[in-house]
C-alpha cells in the first residue's frame, strides 16, 4: 500500500528524502515517514515419510489447479507460528518439523510469502470450511495438478528445495 495521506492525522503527505531509501511519503504534522506496506503471508509445502506432499483444492482460488497451504501472518505472530497455525487450522495436522525455504514476492497481491517445508507423519487431513478437498500425492506428481510454474508462483521454488533435500533430481 502506498500512502498519500497520514493514517494518524489525515494530512496530505509530502515526499521527503529518507537517507538511502530515497523520497518517502512524510507527514509534517506527525514528523513520521510512511513507507509502503504489504501483507506478510506463509506458504507451506507439507510432506510425509512416504515422500508424498499434501495438495489442496480451494475453489475460490481455482477450479482447475491445486495449491499448498498458505495464509496471512497475524500482527504479533512470527512466520513460523503462522505456518504451524495455518496447517492446523486448514488441515488439522501438527507438523513435526518446519524448515524455512526462503521468501517469495507475490506482486499481484502485494504479498511477501514466507516459504516453508513442513514434515508430518502420514494421516488424513481434517479440512476447514475454506478447503474443498486435500490429499497426499507422490512428490513427483505435484507438477501435474498444481498451478503452473511462473515467476509469481511460490510453490515451485519450495518444491525444488524439497526435491533437493530428499535426494530427487531437480529438473522442474
Q: Whereabouts are the PLM-identified features?
A:
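A short linear hydrophobic-aromatic micro-motif
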Residues: 15, 55, 98-102
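Conserved Nudix-box catalytic region and its N-terminal flanking loop in Nudix hydrolases
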Residues: 47-89
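Unchanged
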Residues: 73-157, 170
Amino acid at each position: 500500500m502506498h500512502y498519500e495521506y497520514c493514517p494518524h492525522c489525515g494530512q496530505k503527505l509530502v515526499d521527503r528524502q529518507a537517507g538511502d531509501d530515497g523520497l518517502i511519503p512524510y507527514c509534517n504534522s506527525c514528523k513520521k515517514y510512511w513507507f509502503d506496506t504489504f501483507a506478510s503471508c506463509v506458504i507451506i509445502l507439507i510432506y510425509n515419510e512416504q515422500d508424498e506432499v499434501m495438495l489442496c483444492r480451494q475453489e475460490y482460488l481455482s477450479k482447475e489447479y491445486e495449491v499448498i497451504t498458505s495464509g496471512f501472518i497475524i500482527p504479533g505472530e512470527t512466520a513460523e507460528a503462522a505456518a504451524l497455525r495455518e496447517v492446523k487450522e486448514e488441515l488439522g495436522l501438527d507438523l513435526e518439523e518446519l524448515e524455512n525455504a526462503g521468501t517469495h514476492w507475490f506482486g499481484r497481491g502485494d504479498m511477501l510469502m514466507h516459504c516453508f517445508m513442513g514434515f508430518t507423519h502420514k494421516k488424513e487431513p481434517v479440512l476447514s470450511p475454506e478447503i474443498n478437498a486435500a490429499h497426499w500425492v507422490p512428490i513427483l506428481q505435484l507438477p501435474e495438478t498444481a498451478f503452473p510454474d511462473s515467476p509469481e508462483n511460490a510453490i515451485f521454488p519450495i518444491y525444488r528445495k524439497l526435491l533437493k533435500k530428499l535426494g530427487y533430481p531437480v529438473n522442474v
